[in-house]
């Protein structure tokens, strides 16, 4: 580790922009700074929480996206899935604006690498690639225009963390795909002119090594596809567990359910009990991710969207209808136990059901009183429709 750090400190390292520094982006940025990279961002319009986190991480904050295009070599897009396309458009528009205002350089500018590391469908990745291809064509005859190299990517696992005991970094799996690798010949100053210098390991290869990159294919969308299929199982199972545990809690049966899971399926029991309490700060991001999974399975697999549109609604309810939606990583106050998560969600579901019932009753006054199962059970019998326990 020390030898690797010394090797990196002795060479020029390009600037990496991270849009935007959420939990994952901040973790990756802190790790890159540890290895000597300059990490930058642009925070116009972001929340005070995000601004504070970026400043605490000592990221350089540029005033505009044009500055990112001018000064950075790599842009990592790590945003909620719903912001993936708009973030790409920001950089595309900034590239055009920068090229229009810049003075033509003596040498062609180096390419700008845009790594989309978001939890989005292959179709979304291909759409962003098409956007940048169009921008590259538009700027082809402008000597100040920087070619944008798009790389499809995905992240599986939690943010990087440094182990203080052994100095090793825990790293998530960062998967990339596409026809263009992160190969960039190092730039050094020589005789007052910037010239290309061949190195044993170019800057792109160094960055791949630091990040622990795994290439999964040569096509745009392949890395995103792995992410979608993986998250459908892990986060999909989390959504099912949330429904199961909350319903069991409402029935007063949470403990018996947990006991049965621990006895019959201990690995699943361990996973879901841990996943449920880690979920609240991430629920808002997972809404869009489940919708992207629904699109992926429909577009690439031919399946109906219903299942993952349903899981999206689970996380939307948590985010919008419960106190859990206000949780932030590092500032947790609620939902730190399975019991608290299910209690808060049961309350949220009750309020949501009452709201929907009132809306339905406004259309059909008898709707809120109807129980289709009770009607089915008593159909044709001379028994009053009075539910047990009332």
Task: Give the residues covered by each predicted segment.
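NAD(P)+-binding Rossmann beta1-loop-alpha1 motif at the extreme N-terminus of oxidoreductases
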Residues: 1-76, 97-108, 212
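Eukaryotic N-terminal targeting leaders
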Residues: 1-18, 98-105, 195-201, 209, ...
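Hydrophobic beta-strand scaffold residues
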Residues: 39, 61, 149-150, 255
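Rossmann-like NAD(P)-binding element
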Residues: 59-123, 147, 173-175
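Rossmann-fold dinucleotide-binding core
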Residues: 120-235
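Helical "substrate-binding/catalytic lid" subdomain
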Residues: 223-334
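C-terminal active-site/capping subdomain that shapes the small-molecule cofactor and substrate pocket
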Residues: 287-390
